[in-house]
């Protein structure tokens, strides 16, 4: 399971011109599900994201987590995080989970994050979405539950 995490002042996701998810101070998570992912990947990544100390404390040092600041979370599915561009000019998505499995694991990930009693908003799985955000910092991180990078 892969995630691009962006610390944001605000973010929203729209489908067909309608806002389906919107947050203020918190994290935008673009989430990709791989073909070998399972519940352990969900547990690892949810815990890691919720507890990452990437928000400024009173001294301006990144020392606080999403929980510490009572931040919000916007989770958007993005299978293209498994795009392999090493051969040719068209990405291969053979490492992505099939849509039915990916949707199930995506929903389980969202529920795992909701267990932390934070505001959690989402995009619409499989839809063509427009994501808008104000990146704070900017702070952008890449995570992989298999620790590939």
Swiss-Prot record:
Q: Which GO terms describe its cellular component?
A: cytoplasm
Q: Which domain of life is it from?
A: Bacteria
GO annotation, biological process:
D-amino acid catabolic process
Main location class: cytoplasm
Q: Name one Pfam family in it.
A: Tyr_Deacylase
EC number(s) stated in the UniProt entry for this protein: 3.1.1.96
Q: What class of enzyme is it?
A: hydrolase
The record's annotation in Gene3D superfamilies points to: D-tyrosyl-tRNA(Tyr) deacylase (3.50.80.10)
**Alphabetically ordered keywords of this record:** Cytoplasm, Hydrolase, RNA-binding, tRNA-binding
Extent of motif Gly-cisPro motif, important for rejection of L-amino acids: 137-138
SUPFAM superfamilies reported for this sequence: DTD-like
Where in the cell does this protein reside?
Answer: Cytoplasm
InterPro entries annotated for this entry? Answer: Daa-tRNA_deacyls_DTD, DTD-like_sf
Q: Matching CDD domains, A to Z? A: Dtyr_deacylase
Q: Name one GO molecular function term.
A: tRNA binding
What reactions does this protein catalyze? glycyl-tRNA(Ala) + H2O = tRNA(Ala) + glycine + H(+); a D-aminoacyl-tRNA + H2O = a tRNA + a D-alpha-amino acid + H(+)
Q: How does it assemble?
A: Homodimer.
The free-text domain remark for this protein reads: A Gly-cisPro motif from one monomer fits into the active site of the other monomer to allow specific chiral rejection of L-amino acids.
Q: Of which family is this protein a member? A: Belongs to the DTD family.
Q: What does this protein do?
A: An aminoacyl-tRNA editing enzyme that deacylates mischarged D-aminoacyl-tRNAs. Also deacylates mischarged glycyl-tRNA(Ala), protecting cells against glycine mischarging by AlaRS. Acts via tRNA-based rather than protein-based catalysis; rejects L-amino acids rather than detecting D-amino acids in the active site. By recycling D-aminoacyl-tRNA to D-amino acids and free tRNA molecules, this enzyme counteracts the toxicity associated with the formation of D-aminoacyl-tRNA entities in vivo and helps enforce protein L-homochirality.
Q: Which PANTHER family match?
A: D-AMINOACYL-TRNA DEACYLASE 1, D-TYROSYL-TRNA TYR DEACYLASE
The name on file for this protein is: D-aminoacyl-tRNA deacylase
């Amino acid at each position: 399971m892969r995630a691009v995490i962006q610390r944001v002042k605000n973010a929203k996701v729209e489908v067909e011109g309608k806002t389906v998810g919107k947050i203020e101070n918190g994290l935008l998570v673009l989430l990709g599900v791989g073909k070998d992912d399972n519940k352990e990947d969900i547990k690892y990544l949810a815990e890691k994201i919720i507890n990452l100390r990437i928000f400024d404390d009173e001294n301006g040092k990144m020392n606080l987590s999403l929980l510490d600041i009572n931040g919000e979370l916007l989770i958007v599915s993005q299978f293209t995080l498994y795009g392999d561009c090493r051969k040719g000019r068209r990405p291969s998505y053979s490492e992505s989970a099939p849509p039915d499995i990916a949707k199930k694991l995506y929903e389980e990930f969202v529920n795992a994050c909701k267990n932390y009693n934070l505001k959690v908003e989402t995009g619409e799985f499989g839809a063509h979405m427009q994501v808008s955000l104000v990146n704070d910092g900017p702070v952008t991180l890449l995570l992989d539950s298999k620790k590939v990078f």
